[in-house]
């Protein structure tokens, strides 16, 4: 399967650089997986598309201000993007510099260069850094870090992004990118869903910077997926099994919830799904048989990305690419701060041939 099969033309003007003034004020493109039928609407229409007893599964990760600017003590400027917090004082990070720091190098971080850190070791593309500070990593990042806006949002981060690039239900700090489908849910919307009898459960997947990495191979099967930490606790497993038992739908909010649930399904030795705590490299592309997820709320994704491949595996390749063409024609807003889709699973998708 070729990566180029997942390409589409996207005018620059359709990339959203700011969210809508109201979280739930975005547009919603609904795709019926079995038929391919498209319906245009607004995000609050989701209330009418869900039935009492359906289960919404959210990702409650919280984005950390993971980007730091500074310099090496020896002089050269650098930019640090924390990928993973290892403990109170150590992190794994991407480092952008004209010359990569060597083990033992001292770094001066923060806009005022008040934070001292030491480069301990290099692990492939990541650098292990230790903050030489009494405060823990999260406190330091909250004090001097910048919100890690995606590379396609071509502007500096602003104070408002600390709230806007964060779901209202986020609880577990550790992500360097927001689970963006969740950005559309505000408190009134969550209250309305509860009032209708929609069940809710929360997984955690700390989204890494790898989510924005382009696929650098020509053939999909050759791609090595980045690793992210996920947790699917027993209460989520129980909620999923209860939902299936009552004949209702498991609706994943975002591709990170999909990857968490399907990782937990793969880990189950007996039964449909089991608790999961660990790193996942699950790579979902056409041909994949979904085990748990029946419907999906998601944003519009980058051409040739692993996420449009995941959606194609869910809705069917032709349905997905047609929906994206329609979204461009109708001028939907794309990517993290853009509009949303609601998709029901196409049971025939795993057998469909991918051909443009």
From Swiss-Prot:
Key word NAD present: no
Keywords: Cytoplasm, Queuosine biosynthesis, S-adenosyl-L-methionine, Transferase
Gene Ontology CC: one annotated term: cytoplasm
Enzyme class: transferase
Subcellular location as annotated: Cytoplasm
Principal place of residence: cytoplasm
Its EC number(s): 2.4.99.17
Known pathway: tRNA modification; tRNA-queuosine biosynthesis
InterPro entries: QueA, QueA_dom1, QueA_dom2, QueA_sf
Glycoprotein in keyword set: no
PANTHER family the record matches: S-ADENOSYLMETHIONINE:TRNA RIBOSYLTRANSFERASE-ISOMERASE
Similarity-based family: Belongs to the QueA family.
Function: Transfers and isomerizes the ribose moiety from AdoMet to the 7-aminomethyl group of 7-deazaguanine (preQ1-tRNA) to give epoxyqueuosine (oQ-tRNA).
NCBIfam families cross-referenced by the UniProt entry: PRK00147.1, queA
The protein's name: S-adenosylmethionine:tRNA ribosyltransferase-isomerase
Source species of the chain: Yersinia pestis
Encoding gene per record: queA
């Amino acid at each position: 399967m070729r990566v180029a099969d997942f390409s589409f033309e996207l005018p620059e003007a359709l990339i959203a650089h700011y969210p809508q003034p109201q979280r739930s004020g975005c547009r919603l493109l609904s795709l019926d997986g079995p038929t391919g039928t498209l319906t245009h609407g607004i995000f609050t229409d989701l209330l009418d598309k869900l039935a009492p007893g359906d289960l919404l599964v959210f990702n409650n990760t919280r984005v950390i201000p993971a980007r730091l600017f500074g310099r090496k003590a020896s002089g050269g400027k650098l930019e640090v993007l924390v990928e993973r917090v290892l403990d109170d004082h150590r992190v794994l990070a991407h480092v952008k510099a004209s010359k990569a720091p060597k083990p033992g190098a001292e770094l001066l971080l923060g806009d005022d260069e008040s934070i001292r850190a030491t480069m301990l070791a290099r692990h492939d593309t990541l650098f292990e850094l230790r903050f030489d500070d009494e405060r823990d990593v999260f406190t330091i990042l909250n004090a001097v870090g910048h919100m890690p806006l995606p590379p396609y949002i071509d502007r500096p981060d602003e104070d408002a992004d600390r709230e806007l690039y964060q779901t209202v239900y986020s609880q577990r700090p550790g992500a360097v990118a927001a689970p963006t489908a969740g950005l559309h849910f505000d408190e009134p919307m969550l209250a309305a869903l509860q009032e209708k009898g929609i069940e809710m459960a929360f997984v955690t997947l700390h989204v890494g910077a790898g989510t924005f990495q382009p696929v650098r191979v020509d053939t999909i099967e050759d791609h090595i997926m980045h690793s992210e930490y996920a947790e699917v606790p027993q209460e989520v497993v129980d909620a999923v099994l209860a939902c299936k038992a009552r004949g209702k739908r498991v609706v994943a909010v975002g591709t990170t919830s999909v990857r968490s649930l399907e990782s937990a399904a793969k880990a189950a030795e007996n039964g449909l799904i089991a608790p999961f705590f660990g790193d996942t490299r699950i790579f979902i592309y056409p041909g994949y048989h979904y085990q748990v997820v029946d419907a999906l709320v998601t944003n519009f994704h980058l051409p040739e990305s692993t996420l449009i491949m995941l959606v194609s595996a869910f809705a069917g390749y032709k349905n997905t690419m047609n929906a994206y063409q329609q979204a461009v024609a109708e001028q939907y807003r794309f990517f993290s701060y853009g509009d949303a889709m609601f998709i029901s699973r196409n049971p025939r998708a795993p057998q469909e041939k991918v051909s443009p």
